[in-house]
């Protein structure tokens, strides 16, 4: 069975906006499309990504890109208990805490982000890697 990964907004934006880390994020997205990885995001990742895509490309193109991504990436949600756990955690960034604890709740294997601060806060049950570091593991 393919590894389950949570993909943070910055990774999707690197790919969709062709930012500096585009080539690495493209490799990761290709593995997802090829079915070698199962990818997950939350509704807030859709929101964040949609916001920046709309600013860059307009609403119609943003929706088109998001719908294409959601062909291969599943949306998972946070519940009340997960939100409480996230808010009681040592993480000071509330958004990151909600994403991380949602992924933990859904038994995701790896959390992929370019956020260096979040990478330092991982617990053994859900390791956090940059896209490149994760690809190096494969």
Residue ranges and their predicted role:
Residues 7, 40-41, 77, 113:
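Short beta-strand scaffold positions
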Residues 16-17, 53, 90, 122:
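Short, flexible helix/strand-to-coil boundary loops that buttress conserved ligand/catalytic motifs
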Residues 1-40, 54-61, 135-138:
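Short, well-structured N-terminal submotif of metal-dependent ribonuclease cores
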Residues 74-116:
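Active-site neighborhoods of divalent-metal-dependent phosphate/nucleic-acid chemistry enzymes
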Residues 2-4, 72, 104-138:
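Acidic, PIN/NYN-like endoribonuclease modules and their adjacent C-terminal/linker elements
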Residues 12, 46, 83, 118-119, ...:
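A generic structural signal for short hydrophobic patches within well-formed alpha-helices
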Residues 26, 36, 44-82, 126:
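Active-site-proximal, substrate-binding regions of enzyme catalytic domains
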